Amino acid sequence: GLKEFREGGISIGPDVISNNIGNGSPADGFLDYADTQKWSIIPAIQMMANPSGIVMQEVIEVFYKHFFESFEQHCADIDGIFLVLHGAMVSEGSDDVEGDLFREIHSRLTAKGVNIPVVAVIDFHANVSKDMTDFSTSLYSYRMNPHTDARKAAVEAATLFGILMRGQKASQHHLGTPYVIPPTGLATASDPMKAVLARARAIELQDPDILCINVMGGYSYADIADCGFSLNCCTSGLASVAQGYLDELLIVFEANMSGAYPKEAALKMVLKCIDTEPRGSGPILLVEPADNIGGGTPGDGTGLLSPLLDSGR
């Protein structure tokens, strides 16, 4: 609810800029690049919270109120809309919060006869829907998991945003898949993500028409229709060529798919291994990543606590 977002941070208007400059976030990356380009930024609202459960409708209403008040006031004077999103939000009223937002922005732009690019930087764990791609000009996802490149991805997304604002024509193409991958299978330093991302970067280098290719691992704990691994491409070239690249990347994924579903060790086996190892002088760390520690959560899930207590430890 709003309590968690207030704790995470709600910034409105100019506070969006002052609260992000220099903090190393994606918003900071965008603002820094915008400054180098001498863009005039009209900030609307930023809301943040730790990853958690379904978002209450009151949160969506607050965001819409401030965002679209700013939109209506400045729509006739802006050259584009840039969003910093996660991409896997589920609320009380919608399984596709970001898709709904893009649809509403597109609807209002169309009603006013305004044709400007709408670009968003999104998380590698985004569950990308058809509405997210149909009603945006381009998405741009993080390339690394853990997300050490979040700020860099925002700078690259802002660079693409500038190209589109200068009049570059582009189309966006998406390929959803039935593959729902646990967080433990999404490390970008290991296959299949490593192989898919390497091929995506090679395609971008070899074909100047490809403005970006996004590889999204998806967020498996969201039980929604668009949950899972997906691919996305923004191109200034032929749609058929872009779609062919996405099909090729899916083949690369499927050829390396075994790594996406690692065999997890049972707790009893882990404890047995611990007991048979020579006792060291330091603590033993038992890391349980189920609450998505790679995405910034505190790692304080208690799912293992009961069986550990049952074992007498």
Enumerate the predicted regions with their spans.
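Active-site histidine-anchored catalytic micro-motif
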Residues: 3-6, 53-64, 74-166, 283-305, ...
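Catalytic cores of large soluble enzymes that bind and process phosphate-bearing ligands
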Residues: 18-26, 48, 52-59, 63, ...
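Glycine-rich phosphate/diphosphate-binding loops that line cofactor/substrate pockets in enzymes
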Residues: 35-39, 43, 69-79, 270-284
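Low-complexity, highly charged intrinsically disordered N-terminal segments
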Residues: 31-71
